[in-house]
Structure formats: C-alpha cells, structure tokens
Amino acid sequence: MRKMLLSFKPSVYDKIYAGIKIFEHRRNFPNEPIMAYMYVSKPVRAITGIVMLDNRHKLSDWENDFNTDSDAVARIQEYQKFYRYAMEITEFQETNSISLDDLKKDIDGFVVPQSYIYLDNNPRPVSYTH
C-alpha cells in the first residue's frame, strides 16, 4: 500500500468528512491501494485526516460504460478536462490537526504538495503523524 500526502480544498475535505464524496479524482494515481494523509489548504492549513483509496477507475472507461446515459457522459466528459482517474474512498479517519507551522518547524524542508507527494521514501511526515 502506497502512502502519500494529498492536498485538499476545505470544501472537498468537508464532503469526504460528511460521506458525500465517494470518489477522489486526480490526473494521475498509482494503480494500487493508497493510504493518504489529508492536508487541507487555506484557511485550515493542516493535516486533519487519513483517507484510504482503492480500486482505480479510468474515466474514459466510465464514458464507455455509461454511453447510454447522456447526463452521465456529460459529467464524465467535464471531469476528463481535468482528471484521468477516480479512486474509491473506502475509509476516512479524522485525526488530530497538525498545523502547517508545526510541520515546517519540525520537518526540515517540508513543502505542501500542489497535488500529492509519496511518503514511501520520506518517513518523517509519516512518523510525525503517529
């Protein structure tokens, strides 16, 4: 299972927290289960949860699968302007908040990812959150 740090807008985090959002869409995703620490951007600016992702789907496959539903195809085509993949959100866990200031203070060279960073070869953020 890959470990990564994913960045989220507060509105997206809120939808995951509420159980409304069941897929996470990105331009690139590895084709394997992911445990992601959730960094929430301004105004929160903190790691606030962990999300488990699995079962990567290509949006182009969904376009073919739902080709008889014009509304679904239109939504999929809109998503394809920005994303290639969707992964199922299989689990969510809220954690204690770790502020950006604390992360920068305690982890030399810490930078918030624009989309995501792998933590497999960088155990410091992982050990910080446990």
Task: Report each predicted region and the residues it spans.
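Short, solvent-exposed secondary-structure boundary/capping segments
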Residues: 59-69
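Conserved small/polar residues in nucleotide/adenosyl-binding loops
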Residues: 129-130
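Short beta-strand-centered aromatic/proline hotspots
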Residues: 48-54
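Long, hydrophobic N-terminal alpha-helical segment
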Residues: 1-31
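Residue-level recognition of beta-strand microenvironments
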Residues: 54-56, 92
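Catalytic phosphate/metal-binding cores of nucleic-acid and nucleotide-processing enzymes, i.e., regions
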Residues: 43
